[in-house]
């Protein structure tokens, strides 16, 4: 998220701060922490990227529901495992890895995220 903000001027935040997760999970329950983060930090017109290896993490599914209720522009999902996982059913753009191996799914997700950043800032940074 820092690369998008710094290099592309795109306001971008991530919800992987330990204090945010701990506070919201303690106060609202683990299943609701992403939902609450989206409610507090998401603005109308934002894009939410949701990542779940299995595509069935309840906290992530609730985050998407909050995005829909908060009028975020779109939801991009990255998942793996079952092709018909619940996460994939809720996104506007869905990237899916055909594997049940966590390490493989997570590594492919990382490559895709880096590719998205490169597509957005690439013309400014690279001559290729």
Question: Can you annotate each of these PLM segments?
Answer:
Residues 1-128:
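Glycine-rich phosphate-binding loops that contact phosphosugars or nucleotide phosphates
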